[in-house]
Regions:
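N-terminal Rossmann NAD(P)H-binding glycine-rich loop of SDR-like oxidoreductase domains
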Residues: 1-17
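Amphipathic terminal alpha-helices
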Residues: 2, 242-258
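SDR active-site strand-loop-helix element
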Residues: 7, 33-37, 74-80, 86, ...
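NAD(P)H-binding glycine-rich loop region in Rossmannoid oxidoreductase-like domains
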Residues: 22-55
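Glycine-rich NAD(P)-binding loop of the Rossmann-fold in SDR/ketoreductase-type enzymes
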Residues: 47, 51-62, 98, 102, ...
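Conserved Rossmann-fold NAD(P)-dependent oxidoreductase catalytic core, especially the SDR/UDP-sugar
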Residues: 61-99
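NAD(P)-dependent short-chain dehydrogenase/reductase
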Residues: 113-166
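Mid/C-terminal beta-alpha module of Rossmann-like enzyme folds, strongest
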Residues: 177-178, 183-223, 228-229, 258
Length: 258
């Protein structure tokens, strides 16, 4: 069985320097590395750009150098935030010229470029907003269904814009698709669920599937982060749509009444 090193679980590498990262990878000699460690809070990154750059650019570059030196296949997570600032509608392909408008997106785009310069066979996965439910005793950050459930429980509202469009992905599909992703040719891939609905409609659909009543406040910001998945599909890897994904999630947890 091949040894795969997954970063991002304990925070060890995020606190380490380049020498420690290199030493760890040389010692473990993995056949592949899945680099999932990141500082992904966009607001925090905006307020702490140097820390964001270290975690989201410098660290993965160190990992890439060590991966190349050891011969390990590298798979690293990027983000749909690289598309922040794109004004065109519809699903966005990987080939678009990009100028992200937030610190996190700029860091992720720089990371992609620098990692591919070092390791042309590295696979960079642009992930969307992801979610799971708290059924495995694992820490879970705020996500769409949890935010809706908390709002319903406490009688508070959630805010979304009808001009905001993005995919929302069930994280266990991301996990299931990692093994085939390790066999992809080097390059950048959109990696998540498609969505033809705006975020107001998406939140309403999730609330309906969860069988809860939630007050949704309308905002007026405009954003399109919907990713085109054709490149990934041509390689044989597919995701549910955003709407199919929440139903898949509820079935997995035995909560789908259909």
């Amino acid at each position: 069985m091949k040894r795969i090193l997954i970063t991002g679980g304990s925070g060890f590498l995020a606190a380490a320097g380049e020498a420690e990262v290199t030493e760890t990878i040389q010692k473990l000699q993995p056949a592949a590395i899945v680099h999932a460690a990141a500082l992904s809070d966009t607001g925090y990154c905006a307020q702490h750009p140097e820390e964001a750059h270290r975690a989201n650019v410098e660290l993965p570059v160190w990992v890439a150098k060590a991966a190349c030196a050891s011969g390990a296949k590298l798979l690293a997570f990027s983000s749909d935030q690289v598309y922040a600032g794109i004004t065109q509608p519809g699903p966005l392909p990987e080939t678009l010229p990009l100028q992200p408008i937030n610190v996190y997106g700029r860091c992720k785009l720089e990371m992609e470029q620098r990692v591919l310069e070092l390791c042309p066979d590295a696979v960079l996965l642009r992930a969307s907003w992801m979610y799971d439910l708290p059924g495995y005793g694992l820490p879970i950050r705020g996500n769409l269904p949890l935010n809706l459930l908390r709002a319903a429980l406490h009688g508070t509202s959630v805010t979304f814009s009808a001009n905001d469009c993005r995919g929302v992905t069930y994280v266990r599909q991301v996990i299931a698709n990692l093994a085939p992703a390790l066999s992809l040719p080097g390059g950048v891939y959109n990696f998540g669920s498609s969505n033809t609905e705006n975020m107001v409609h998406t939140a309403q659909q999730f609330a309906q599937e969860l069988d809860i009543a939630v007050q949704i406040e309308a905002a007026d910001w405009t954003r399109n982060l919907v990713m085109d998945g054709k490149k990934l599909e041509k390689a044989g890897i597919r995701f549910d749509t955003t709407q199919q994904g929440i139903r898949h999630c509820l079935r997995d947890y035995g909560l789908d009444s259909r």
